[in-house]
């Protein structure tokens, strides 16, 4: 008789995040419809979006004998679940992107900044951009991005020449953009040069002065690219202000991460035209979101894809070869798995390694500058 595989999925099905939790559960159910046979059973457990609720949900899951836990969503909930799962040797594939909760049988499927930063910097350096400015939110995410950038540039002999943090709740970025653009010095240099030219009576000086009438600044900034890890209206506001203070593309390239892909109408902001950003390949993702809308009549949250991929991963492992389907050795298969968000593989340290394509923003969307990998290089090779 075939082995029954029990998998628990821990989600906030009540509380403030219940709608998001339901969308993740819906996505998991699509994977079951697509791939599972009668020997795969998934059991949902409500974390209530709290640490206490997550602990109770994990205890219920291990009590019925689950072989693997998918979720929870929040890093604090993952911390609460870890000791419960570890006590019975059950691995956890969580939807968090916090590397701090990864390891020792806990694998995070979320998109960690390090890999995205590495991808975009690798491409930018290949295009000759070695001097970087960065404008990051003053929070854990922003600090993680900056740390990732420091690691990425060090191995490529590039450097950070300007770094500014901003309040993640801010709406006015004028001072910040003006400072990083070194606008006051460059504007002063223009005024001084104009004054100098006005004192001359030769034709060349007069022609030069006429050309300078349309400028606000003189001289270049001391960086080749600006990393903007923000998204949405903040991203658009900062990019627009940088252009206002004479930091223009393609002379200085604006760079972004995968959250740019969730910024609505990014192509409508002229100052972001020609920017580059790292993003997961979109073909399978678009198919998944289309099917989700067909099933449920609404568009899911962006991270719903993680629940689909985690469930699909569990089903594939359950259906292949005999033995311990969800052992750590099998979870970290070096060839990886092809998911909604592209190729990924779980690493022994508990982080999902992912592939990214490099996109350039255009007036009607984007063009792919470098496609994502379709196979992983050998680990350690």
Residue ranges and their predicted role:
Residues 1-381:
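Extracytosolic ligand-binding ectodomains
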């Amino acid at each position: 008789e075939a082995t029954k595989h029990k998998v628990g999925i821990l989600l906030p099905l009540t509380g403030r995040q219940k709608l998001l939790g339901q969308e993740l559960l819906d996505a998991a159910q699509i994977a079951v419809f697509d791939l599972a046979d009668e020997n795969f059973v998934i059991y949902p457990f409500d974390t209530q979006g709290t640490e206490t609720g997550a602990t109770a949900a994990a205890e219920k899951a291990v009590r019925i004998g689950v072989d693997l836990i998918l979720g929870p969503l929040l890093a604090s909930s993952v911390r609460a679940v870890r000791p419960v799962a570890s006590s019975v040797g059950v691995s956890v594939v969580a939807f968090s992107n916090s590397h701090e909760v990864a390891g020792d049988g806990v694998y995070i499927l979320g998109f960690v900044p390090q890999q995205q930063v590495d991808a975009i910097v690798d491409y930018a350096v290949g295009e000759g951009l070695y001097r970087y400015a960065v404008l990051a939110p003053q929070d854990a995410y922003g600090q993680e991005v900056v740390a990732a950038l420091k690691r990425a540039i060090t191995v490529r002999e590039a450097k950070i020449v300007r770094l500014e943090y901003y309040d993640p709740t801010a709406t006015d970025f004028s001072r910040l953009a003006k400072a990083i653009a070194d606008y006051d010095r460059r504007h002063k240099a223009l005024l001084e040069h104009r004054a100098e030219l006005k004192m001359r009576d030769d034709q060349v000086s007069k022609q030069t002065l006429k050309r300078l009438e349309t400028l606000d600044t003189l001289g270049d900034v001391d960086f080749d690219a600006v990393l903007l890890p923000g998204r949405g209206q903040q991203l658009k506001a900062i990019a627009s202000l940088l252009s206002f203070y004479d930091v223009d593309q393609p002379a200085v390239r604006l760079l972004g991460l995968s959250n740019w892909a969730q910024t609505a109408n990014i192509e409508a902001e002229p100052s972001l035209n020609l920017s580059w950003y790292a993003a997961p390949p979109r073909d399978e993702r678009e198919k998944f979101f289309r099917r989700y809308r067909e099933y449920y009549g609404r568009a899911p949250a962006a991270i719903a894809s993680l629940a689909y991929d985690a469930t699909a991963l569990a089903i594939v492992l359950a259906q292949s070869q005999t033995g311990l389907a969800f052992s750590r050795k099998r979870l970290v298969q070096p060839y990886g798995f092809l998911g909604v968000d592209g190729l990924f593989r779980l690493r022994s340290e508990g982080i999902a390694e992912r592939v990214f394509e490099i996109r350039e923003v255009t007036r009607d969307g984007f063009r792919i500058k470098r496609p994502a990998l379709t196979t992983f290089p050998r680990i350690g090779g």
